Amino acid sequence: VKNDYTEPLTHEELEEVRNNPISVALTVGKKVPKEWFEKTTGKKILGLACGGGQQGPVFAVKGYDVTIMDFSKSQLQRDDMVAKREGLKINTVQGDMTKPFPFENETFDIIFNPVSNVYVEDLENIYKEAARVLKKGGLLMIGFMNPWIYMYDADIVWDKPDEELLLKFSIPFNSRELEEEGKITINPEYGYEFSHTLETQIRGQLKNGLAMIDFYESCDNRHRLSRYGNDYIATLCIKL
């Protein structure tokens, strides 16, 4: 699917990156504060579910030792393409976040995980494995959906601006279960989505020895729920 996350950076865009402070996004609507990257001097970074030829090349240009792990081979090919074009070194690994990560304990200084766990039903493995492969004092930067937006019918939110917004679903929203119950139909092109709860997202990190040291919210202004609150959350945790 062609969208904002599948368009690799151009040579000109990467030249701009070289001459400016690091600028990457975990969520829609806001860039990660550059101070987050200043909280470690380590340069070994894992971009988790982070393929597409965007963040990976930015990190490489900024002097990081970059590994990108993604389930999508086509997304990884975009990183390989940009790396070859620009003479950058990016290690690409095809992998599944729901399985053990193919890395040794305490390998990385930073894990950078843009919004993606909305497509994963059980977060337990992601946070356990992230903590395992992070070095002590390493940073986990993760973006995820604010669960409240899943209480509304997405078709009405996005495609029917004149219809009244009504609460429809309880949290945690699980589109696979709802489809099995005959309550919704999911377009296979987009896959199943899972809202999770703030407890599963935040406590999932804390109970694995990750302490939260910063946090922000951001907003996707392309839909009308954004008038009522922020629909994205990003957290910064440090491994104790």
What do the PLM-derived regions correspond to, one by one?
Residues N208-L210, R224-L240:
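Core SAM-dependent methyltransferase catalytic element
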Residues T98-I111:
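A short acidic, Gly/Pro-enriched loop at the edge of an enzyme's catalytic core
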Residues E124-L139:
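A short glycine-rich, Lys/Arg-flanked "PGG" loop and its adjoining helix->strand segment in the class I
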Residues D109-E124:
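A short SAM/SAH-binding and catalytic strip from SAM-dependent methyltransferases
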Residues Y192-F215:
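Short alpha-helix
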Residues L9-K43:
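Conserved alpha-helix/loop element of class I SAM-dependent methyltransferases that forms part
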Residues K43-P100:
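Class I SAM-dependent methyltransferase SAM/SAH-binding core
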Residues L139-E179:
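Conserved class I S-adenosyl-L-methionine
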